[in-house]
Amino acid sequence: MAVQQKIRIKLKSYDHSLVDKWALRIIDVVKQTDAIIFGPIPLPTKSHVYTVNRSPHVDKKSREQFSFSSHKRLIEIINPTSRTIDMLMKLELPSGVDVEIKS
């Protein structure tokens, strides 16, 4: 039995609509090359909350909280061809989306 090659693409952004839009765009590009694709798989959203004092030195009880969420999507490509990899390398993603590729 032959070993299947696979590529995992993990997209991360603070804007969920941007992640979804680019995940669908990557899927469209990969479908043109006849590779098998799974996804986009939504991964858990992480919320980050930062608490700071409102004043520089008094009123410890007066605080302000800032929060933001990071959204992630996972795309798996099974048996990618060289054409698939070339087309993925030509994609220009916006600066708001972080891409992590593992094989």
Curated annotation (Swiss-Prot):
Give the superkingdom in one word.
Bacteria
Which keywords does this chain's UniProt record carry?
Answer: Ribonucleoprotein, Ribosomal protein
Identify the InterPro entries for this entry: Ribosomal_uS10, Ribosomal_uS10_CS, Ribosomal_uS10_dom, Ribosomal_uS10_dom_sf
Tell me the Gene Ontology biological-process terms attached to this UniProt entry: translation
* Pfam families the UniProt entry points to: Ribosomal_S10 (PF00338)
The answer to keyword DNA-binding applying to this record is: no
Q: Which SUPFAM superfamilies match?
A: Ribosomal protein S10
In its keyword annotation, does this UniProt entry include Transmembrane? Answer: no
PROSITE patterns per the UniProt record, alphabetical: RIBOSOMAL_S10
Molecular function (Gene Ontology), one example? structural constituent of ribosome
Q: What GO cellular component entries does it have?
A: ribonucleoprotein complex; ribosome
Query: What does the annotation say about its assembly with partners?
Result: Part of the 30S ribosomal subunit.
Homology family: Belongs to the universal ribosomal protein uS10 family.
Q: Which PANTHER family match?
A: 30S RIBOSOMAL PROTEIN S10 FAMILY MEMBER
Q: Which HAMAP family match?
A: Ribosomal_uS10
Explain the purpose of this protein: Involved in the binding of tRNA to the ribosomes.
Protein name per the record: Small ribosomal subunit protein uS10
